[in-house]
Amino acid sequence: MNPQYKLHTFSDGTTNETQLQSIYDLNQANTPEVGSLESMNHLKQLIELSAYNLLVLDDDEVIGFIICMRESSGYGSENYKFFTQRLKKFLYVDRIAIDEQHRKAGLGQAIYENIFVEARNNDLPIALE
């Protein structure tokens, strides 16, 4: 991963409106690979439910993100429910997106490596589609 890129954890209340809009826009640009969000409010609700998230920043520009849930979040996704019926605890990768102009730069790998460390440190299996 290019050293100019920075990974930052984020949660409800730690992102500004510009970053939230960038996350939303990046999400929508990556549908159908990630589920479409109905609105910014929908994104904010996901972040409220989430347990561990990362932003990839190039200076202050959001160029990637991942949103992850724990087993107790109450998330309504059918894919998430599949894992709640099979695992007692887990870290669920709900969505990950990288800006098209920044792909093939190791960003996805860096994000997943960070998620693997978080899961290992908390003795959690990772659940994803």
Task: Identify the residue ranges that each predicted region occupies.
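Short amphipathic alpha-helix that is part of the acyltransferase structural core
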Residues: 1-41, 57-63
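Short loop/turn motifs at secondary-structure junctions and domain boundaries
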Residues: 44-50
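Conserved beta-hairpin
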Residues: 51-66, 70
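Ordered hydrophobic segments in well-structured contexts
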Residues: 55, 65, 90-92, 125-127
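Conserved acyl-donor/pantetheine-binding loop and adjacent beta-alpha core of acyl/acetyltransferases
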Residues: 67-95
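Conserved acetyl-CoA-binding loop-helix of GNAT-fold acetyltransferases
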Residues: 98, 104-117
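Conserved beta-strand-loop-alpha-helix junction that forms the acyl-donor binding cleft
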Residues: 100-103, 127-129
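Conserved GNAT acetyl-CoA-binding A-motif
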Residues: 119-129
